[in-house]
């Protein structure tokens, strides 16, 4: 069954398409694997417009990575994804794993399928902040270097959902937010909010920046985020790219900063890959 989404998610997918097409072009002949965590069924339906569209998995498959590995959340999603990805398969280049990304054994299965000679790109788009843990990010980075020591590139859709903002000041939610960040430094943001020293906009900014600091502390040369062009105000997420190359940062900003129409809108025009 297609995943039900809102128009802001459609906007996110259009931005992702521009990003992943441009990113794949800079690979040229380099061997690189695409790893999709928290993968869904492969297609989605917009609640606002009742139109169907490809999800991120099929959009990525239209680019030129050497291998694609998707971690589906459950068996129905895995079966749907297997059916929809079949036309794109060449030389056994698509693999689908079923499991929870927070489990060590799932991460091991994922990287067992990645050749040591290949670099990797990981797309992390969790179904809410409770689904993402800092420990998982660290495991991915630890497993993800190629034989030359090149660190894995990460594109993280950081969830700035209302649930995170509401739960920030709830004692019973401290454990889940601490798992997201891997530390308790976020409590300083919480206290500043409770003391009335910062508003909601600054809370959002500091939550994103704190996550970026953690990625920088893991050794990445470039960690950047961008607030999506005003489609949802405030935005429900921030894309964050962690890479040792500055090229990907420019691609991120180009993809998410430009105004755009959606497929359901009259002036929409699909850009073709160069």
Regions found by a protein language model. Give the residues of each.
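Short amphipathic alpha-helix with an adjacent loop that forms part of the alpha/beta core around
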Residues: 104-115, 138-141
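SAM cofactor-binding core of SAM-dependent methyltransferases
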Residues: 5, 14-109
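Conserved beta-strand signature within the Rossmann-like core of class I S-adenosyl-L-methionine
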Residues: 146-165
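Flexible, glycine-/basic-rich loop-and-beta segments that form/coincide
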Residues: 170, 176-177, 246-273
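A conserved mid-domain beta-alpha-beta active-site/ligand-binding segment of alpha/beta enzyme cores
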Residues: 165-231
